[in-house]
Structures are given as structure tokens and as C-alpha cells.
């Protein structure tokens, strides 16, 4: 499974890239979706490669994403009661199901887009590809480090500090 994050906004967006980001439901900066690694999705990602970054998601990072940021319809946090409604006993079991190919949009009442904070320490240059010490494009397993930097602890979903 691939994690795809939008890193640039709407201004100056090429029409093909705009259509691709709409199809992926990536309508805002720092939003994340999880997609399968198929030729169709790879073609879409290459079309919008200047505005997105993506890579292979590992199970530990996926569990962290589900625990901290996944939302049910109505902005309800994903808790043990909601997980049981979806037919799983734990977040780990749900993460296994997603890693085996099930998409977030396949789950009833689960929001398919995960909202993240900007990364701690900021992005590298968003205008350059990852291979040239930038942020856009394919980054492989390093996407997990970026996601962990974007899961800032201490901030509630409503934007208020827990302290």
C-alpha cells in the first residue's frame, strides 16, 4: 500500500494534476490517502508528481495513523467501539486488513482522507523532486519518517493544546 500526501496548494495547478488530485480526494495541503500500488494509481501519481509525495507505508506507521488521526463520519475519533462496528477487534487487526489491500473508502462511515499537520522541521524544497533533496515525488520507505514528523503529539483534533 502507498501513502500519498499533497504538499502543494491549488495556485498554478495544471489541469491534469488538478483532476488527479480531485480523483484521489486530496483537496488540501497535508492531506493523506492510502492507495493500492497498481498501474492505474501509479499513472495518476506520475501525472501529479510535482504536487504530491508518496511511498510504501509500513504497518507500524499505519497503526499510528489510525490511532491518532483516523476519523469516522461526523468527526468522531476512531475508538474501540467504532472499530468493533467495522468488524475488527483492534487497530492492529484493521491495519492488517488495510495492508492486505482493503482501502479506507471500503469501510462504512470511515473518512477516507487523513488530515495531518505540517511536518516538524518543515518540508525540504517543495519545488524539487525528492531525489534532488526536495519533497515532491516518490520517496519509498522514507514516507514513514515524514508521516511521523507530521503526527505532532499534544494537539487535539479540534486544534487545541492538551496541556
Swiss-Prot record:
User: Where does this protein come from, organism-wise?
Assistant: Picrophilus torridus (strain ATCC 700027 / DSM 9790 / JCM 10055 / NBRC 100828 / KAW 2/3)
What molecular function terms (GO) are annotated for this protein?
RNA binding; structural constituent of ribosome
Domain of life of the native organism: Archaea
The alphabetical list of record keywords is: Ribonucleoprotein, Ribosomal protein
Coiled-coil annotated spans: none
Q: How does it assemble?
A: Part of the 50S ribosomal subunit.
* UniProt cross-references to InterPro entries, sorted A to Z: Ribo_uL30_ferredoxin-like_sf, Ribosomal_uL30, Ribosomal_uL30_arc, Ribosomal_uL30_euk_arc, Ribosomal_uL30_ferredoxin-like
* NCBIfam families xref list: PRK06049.1, uL30_arch
Q: Name it.
A: Large ribosomal subunit protein uL30
What Gene Ontology terms describe where this protein resides (cellular component)?
cytosolic large ribosomal subunit
Query: Which family does the similarity line name?
Result: Belongs to the universal ribosomal protein uL30 family.
Which Pfam family, an example, fits this chain? Ribosomal_L30
Record Gene3D superfamilies: 1.10.15.30, Ribosomal protein L30, ferredoxin-like fold domain
Q: What are the BP-aspect GO terms?
A: maturation of LSU-rRNA from tricistronic rRNA transcript (SSU-rRNA, 5.8S rRNA, LSU-rRNA); translation
Amino acid at each position: 500500500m502507498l501513502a500519498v500526501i499533497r504538499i502543494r496548494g491549488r495556485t498554478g495547478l495544471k489541469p491534469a494534476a488538478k483532476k488527479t488530485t480531485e480523483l484521489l480526494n486530496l483537496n488540501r495541503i497535508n492531506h493523506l490517502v492510502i492507495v493500492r500500488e497498481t498501474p492505474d494509481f501509479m499513472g495518476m501519481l506520475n501525472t501529479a508528481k510535482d504536487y504530491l509525495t508518496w511511498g510504501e507505508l509500513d504497518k507500524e506507521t499505519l497503526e499510528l495513523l489510525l490511532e491518532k488521526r483516523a476519523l469516522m463520519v461526523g468527526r468522531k475519533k476512531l475508538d474501540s467501539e467504532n472499530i468493533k462496528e467495522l468488524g475488527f477487534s483492534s487497530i492492529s487487526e484493521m491495519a492488517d486488513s488495510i495492508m492486505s489491500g482493503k482501502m479506507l473508502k471500503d469501510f462504512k462511515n470511515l473518512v477516507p482522507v487523513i488530515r495531518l499537520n505540517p511536518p516538524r522541521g518543515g518540508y525540504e524544497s517543495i519545488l524539487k523532486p525528492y531525489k534532488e533533496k526536495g519533497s515532491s515525488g516518490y520517496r519509498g520507505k522514507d514516507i514513514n519518517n515524514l508521516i511521523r514528523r507530521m503526527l505532532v503529539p499534544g494537539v487535539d483534533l479540534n486544534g487545541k493544546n492538551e496541556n
